[in-house]
Design a protein with these regions (language model features):
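Conserved RNA-binding domains used in RNP assembly and mRNA/RNA metabolism
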Residues: 1-93
Length: 93
């Protein structure tokens, strides 16, 4: 599937948050990957990364703009699902 400019739902895993205190190695417990879910319009999809934007405007013009870009390593992605949207919005884009 060609993903460029598609709205997608992504399930991926991230590193768990670092523990801020010092501990002896013998006291440290293994963390677990954190399951994450994100929704956004695809800006970049290649062999290394998926970049999505949660907010976009002007998608039908040469002045496309987006904010809040998130880059997810492809190795962290568990699934990508295209979201179909109805294109009958009556306001400005």
């Amino acid at each position: 599937m060609r993903w460029k400019h598609k709205l997608v739902y992504v399930e991926w895993v991230d590193a768990s948050q670092p523990v801020p205190e010092w501990h002896f190695f013998s006291e440290i417990e293994a963390g677990v990957p954190v399951p994450c879910r994100s929704v956004g319009w695809v800006h970049t999809y290649n062999k290394d990364i998926l970049m999505i934007l949660p907010a976009v405007t002007g998608m039908d013009t040469e002045h496309r703009s987006g904010m809040g870009s998130m880059t997810i390593p492809r190795s962290a992605i568990r699934s990508i699902t295209a979201i179909e949207i109805e294109e009958n919005y009556n306001g400005n884009t």
